Amino acid sequence: MRVTVNSIAAALSIGFVAVSPLSAQNATNCDPTANTKGDIAKAQFSMARAISASEKGNPTRDLQEVFRLVDNGNDNPTARNFLRGQAYIIYLMQPNAQPVVQRGTLGMTTNPTATVDLYAAADSAFSIVEKASPECATVTSQWRQQKPWLNALNGAINALNAGQLDSAEMLAKRSLVLDRHAPYAYSVLGSVAQQRKNSAAAMDYWKQALTAAGTDTIYADVRTKTLYEIASAGSDRADAATGAAKRAAAKEAIKPWQDYMAVANNDLLLADAIDNESRMYVDAGDSVSVSSVYAPMIANPSKYGEISLVHAGVVATRNGHQADALKLFDAALAQNPYSRDAINNLAATYIQNNQFPKAFPLIDKLVSIDPSNPDNQLLYAFAYQGLYKGTKDKKLQKIYTDSLVYFNNKSENMPVKLSVTEFTRRPDQTMLAGTIENRGTTPKTYSVSFEILDKSGTVISTETASVGPVAPKKSGTFRITSAKGGAYGYRYKPVT
């Protein structure tokens, strides 16, 4: 008998980034085109028409007029470059706009066949404005983060999530040309470098992401993601090392996990962090400190989710801290009365602690929700074995022995074994997956009906899966999806 928990596949992706409309761009202390006259005033008028046309039609002719007018003189370079930068951005916002075009395409008559990198040109123009008028940095930043930047950044994120590393790198770097202050592109480049096994480059990009994110709450998600990736990379280095190098790498990986856990807001990833940090302590030769990983959870379990509490309980069990494990599993069960992992592990821990009367009601509940799993019957057998060892009363020993044999045989002779390997719960969806093993001697097709439960045990959805035909001594798989969210557990009737 052992305490178990389902494994976690920890996956992270950056969410899409949004941007404010052109009409929302303003800064009370900045007006680079105030009190202009002549060509600049005319260019400003053409820019207003271009902005209006960009929302309803084609602004190209107005943009070409802006470029012609701002190039027709050298006075007031701040105003000219502000209008020039705006024009580059609006041009890039048009459908099928290319990042590099010939000057003639923009209506420029001087050297018309020469090319212009519009991202670099916009950056150069806005940089001149920012240097001359620092108070305009806010409004130029809003222009820098318009649709061209957004498209490059979200394109980089899409490419990264699709495993297209070259495209992800190119697009992320393109977005940095326009805006080097947001953390998203650095995070993408860090992930690209990590997947290319370039740990040094990945760490450099992740540090830049953290610096860019700072303490701004708008960047909290990317900051948390980056801290997780830094910590995961540390565990990977420790796992790949041996001997003294492994101990040193594991010791170094502990602090990054602590940093991540301090801000973690995802129960699944926090559970993964608990597993990793505790493992790093063990690999570093400091098993005594493992309890520090979950000590805050025992002190205030209501701050944590059931999954992280269960994982912490497993960590406590593996390191011989049974009393801590009981508290953690009990806290998890208080949060979710239908958590199979919490029920199973709490029952197993009670048995290990010779608290058999507390184990039996939990085993009863486990069998009621998961009746076709032979492992559950073995918990009865282990409990009766413990009771047998704890008494010298011959009559009781006979009763306990008979019960042990009964439940052991019941487990061994079950014709089918159903194992749930995935239970994914989302606000608007629930997914269950697993296997059905045919322990019989003839092929068979199985039908299993799952009831999805809320926290009170009320059925919120019923889903049926058919598996088979399954050959003798082989297994078939099932996967069901419910459109109902808010699930806490499941149950099914015995599979025959």
Where are these regions (language model features)?
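Canonical tetratricopeptide repeat
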Residues: L83, I90, N154, V188, ...
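Residue-level recognition of tetratricopeptide repeat
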Residues: Q44, R49-I51, Q86-M93, I157, ...
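Short coil/linker segments at helix-helix boundaries
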Residues: R49-A53, R61, I89-D166, Q195, ...
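Single-residue signature of alpha-solenoid repeat helices
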Residues: P59-D62, T115, A122, A168, ...
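Structural motif corresponding to the intra-repeat A-B loop/turn of tetratricopeptide repeats
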Residues: Y91, A162, R196, R237, ...
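Hydrophobic/aromatic packing residues within the alpha-helices of TPR/SEL1-like helical repeat arrays
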Residues: L63, F67-V70, Y119, F126, ...
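Short coil turns that delineate tetratricopeptide repeat
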Residues: N74-D75, P134, R180, G214, ...
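TPR alpha-solenoid repeat register
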Residues: R80, T138-V139, A185, Y219-A220, ...
